Amino acid sequence: MGFFNKDKGKRSEKEKNVIQGALEDAGSALKDDPLQEAVQKKKNNR
């Protein structure tokens, strides 16, 4: 995956906000998904 992140540090503030917004939208879309809930539970137990 490192290949795709080669210019990770060059992202503009606007681009970061767009990405964050998309992630939040995806997260809310999966809110009631049992698999997503299991993944979150697993992350919280670490």
Swiss-Prot record:
Cross-referenced InterPro entries, in alphabetical order? SASP_SspJ
A biological-process GO annotation? sporulation resulting in formation of a cellular spore
Induction conditions? Expression is sigma G-dependent, and to a very small extent sigma F-dependent.
Cellular location(s):
Spore core
The protein's UniProt keywords, in alphabetical order, are: Sporulation
- Name the segments for region: Disordered: 24-46
Q: Where are the transmembrane segments?
A: none
Checking NCBIfam families in the record gives: spore_sspJ (TIGR02863)
Tell me the protein's name. Small, acid-soluble spore protein J
